[in-house]
Amino acid sequence: VKEDLLTFEGKPLFPERRAYTVAYELSPAERELYDLVTEYVRTEMGRAECISQAGDRKRGNNVGFALTVLQRRLASSPEAILRSLERRQRRLEDRLRELTRIQETASPAEKEQTDARFDAKLPSLSIHDYEDMDLETTDSERLQFETQVEYVVDRATAAQTIPELRAEIAILEDLIRVAYKVR
């Protein structure tokens, strides 16, 4: 988008972006973490796609977005993925406690509305929104967007039942253990 902007003279307004890939070797521990997080993302992406195809596109898109951001953080640094996994685990544990409390105390009608109520709080984000952040974005806009990104990344899940949520939390615990070894 911004690459297409021209000056009044018809010249590109911004210089051409050039990205270079730098090859480097992963240690065995880094490779294990990369493979495990990639498998987690791949599996959950499949579940997100099923959710979208079943008619809940917003939820499916949010889960897909959250997982894509996690995968990018994996490429960023071991510390970045560790912190992201820890935050995600904490938020999903909070959600599990809340769902368990509702299941124990709510009427049947309230129990049916539980999932919709949690998902309704998440803003809709896409990877295009994430990629479109540029240098012209103000610090305030960037902070607001990053806050929304963290909110979705930490909370969006394909789990649809309490046992599925427990299983995802257990996977995150395993990933965190491996990430600590890499750190």
Predicted regions and their residues:
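ASCE P-loop NTPase motor core, strongest for the SF2 helicase catalytic module
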Residues: 1, 39, 46, 157-183
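Amphipathic heptad-repeat alpha-helical coiled-coil/stalk segments that mediate oligomerization
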Residues: 103-151
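Amphipathic alpha-helical coiled-coil segments with heptad-repeat character
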Residues: 31, 60, 71, 82, ...
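Short, functional N-terminal and low-complexity linear motifs
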Residues: 1-6, 50-55, 137-140, 155-163
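Generic N-terminal initiation segments characterized by hydrophobic and/or small/turn-forming residues
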Residues: 67, 93, 119-122, 132, ...
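Inter-lobe coupling linker of SF2 helicases/translocases
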Residues: 1-122
